Amino acid sequence: MITSKQRSYLRTLSNTLQPIFQLGKAGIEENFLKQIVGALESRELIKIKVLNNSGMTAREASDIICEAINAEAVQTIGSKCVFYKTSLTKPKIELP
């Protein structure tokens, strides 16, 4: 669990990020989750865009993804979600 101060710090870091995944009509599948886990391990902070044809809102997708991979939802605005998970091998981001 991250504090509100840490969440605020992560939000500032995520402002310049571009979404690296798009969630479409295929939905949240096991392969999609594996790709997210790999990206979080290497980057620690990622942004995902939820397309209109996915059949779910960004908040719903964020809740499902966080529960499935034990990540922290930093922010959900519009159709974009930001996730954070500390890397087990090489932590890059040092939280305040």
Where are these predicted regions, by residue range?
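Positively charged, polar, low-complexity stretches
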Residues: M1-P96
